[in-house]
Design a protein with these regions (language model features):
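Hydrophobic positions on the alpha1 helix immediately C-terminal to the Walker A/P-loop
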Residues: 226-227
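Mixed-charge (Asp/Glu-Lys/Arg
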Residues: 1-220, 283-317
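Conserved P-loop NTPase "ATPase switch" module shared by AAA+ and STAND
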Residues: 211, 216-222, 231-291
Length: 317
């Protein structure tokens, strides 16, 4: 069920991740769920604990689902995560811990990257208790389906697990590789040096309805660096709220954009079908050089970097 693409993670890969890299899975699994929810058009009010926040009391996360999806019911969802080898035990412990204060309008959702053989039986028993409006459980096979519906998250977790998605790369990974290609490494603030107005305009456009945004620069990497700087700053150094993804072929572009979603797509190939991506909920950012005609009305001309601010960017690292 991986669309014939071995460069993308499957249910078996998620299971193997939890088994062989347990600490890594424990650290990054909440971030994966957050990215999946961000790319789910029906989801809002998303709050997922990641990093140091996972040790705090309370649910691991929550979200509001406006209408049912293939995997999630509508309503206020309360999430618990478990990456350890016995999902039945962990789910039961989490459920018992929460049911005394459960509300009849809440949905309890337990999510694991492992395969869970008796998942449906466990759900049926808990559902019959009536503590929650509904009880759901998602395992590795469910997550594989969800990833197919959330291509940017699919690419991100595949990169994390050392796979190399064909003709696609997250802007996060591109920046990590590009910034380290020099010595010293390039600071992300370098690419907004003297470009406060351009950054403000871009953030304003991104805050509106999905659209085509054109960035004109003298060189492609400069425009991508500007994108990385603005989006990282907007999301407090985390790209997950916008899921910016670079696409390098029409084949991969068409596969990603035919289903509803959200986020930012950056086509680096000739004549992408931007209308399809936009109508399905995604912003499209095209990179133009000085000789390329624009196709939309929203164009940002990147001025040359301000020398003194560029020096300050290196000094502040």
């Amino acid at each position: 069920m991986n669309n014939g693409n071995p460069e993308l993670i499957t249910a078996s890969g998620l299971k193997r991740w939890a088994e062989t890299k347990s600490r890594d899975a424990q650290s990054y699994f909440p971030e994966l769920i957050r990215r999946l929810l961000v790319e789910t058009p029906e989801a809002s009010e998303i709050s997922i604990r990641t990093g140091d926040g996972v040790s705090l009391p309370g649910y691991d996360g929550e979200a509001i689902i406006k209408k049912p999806t293939k995997l999630l019911p509508a309503g206020l969802l309360r999430f618990e995560f478990g990456t350890n080898k016995d999902p039945n035990k962990k789910a039961t412990e989490d459920y018992n811990k929460r049911k005394e204060k459960a509300s009849s309008d809440e949905v309890f959702v337990f999510v694991t990257p492992r395969r869970w053989r008796n998942k449906e039986e466990w759900v049926s028993r808990r559902q019959a208790e009536g503590s929650f409006k509904e009880v759901k459980a998602l395992d590795a096979d469910d997550l594989e389906l969800w990833l197919q519906l959330a291509p940017s998250a699919h690419i991100w977790i595949s990169e994390k697990l050392d796979l190399h998605p064909r003709d696609a790369i997250t802007l996060e990974k591109w920046w990590d590789e590009f910034s380290k290609s020099t010595d010293p490494s390039l600071p992300v603030k370098l690419f907004v040096a003297g470009r406060n107005a351009a950054a403000r305009d871009f953030r304003s456009m991104l805050g509106g309805d999905p659209r085509l945004i054109s960035l004109r620069s003298e060189w492609e990497d400069d425009a991508l660096g500007f994108l990385a700087a603005v989006l990282a700053e907007q999301n407090e150094t985390n790209f997950s709220n916008t899921s910016p993804t670079i696409i390098r072929s029409a084949e991969v572009w068409d596969r990603i954009t035919t289903s509803p979603g959200s986020g930012v797509l950056i086509p680096l190939f000739y004549d992408p079908n931007t209308n399809c991506a936009i109508s399905n909920g995604r912003h499209v950012v095209e990179v133009l050089d000085s000789n390329t005609a624009r196709r939309g009305k929203d164009v940002i001309e990147l001025p040359r970097l301000n020398r003194s601010e560029a020096v300050d960017a290196f000094r502040s690292e």
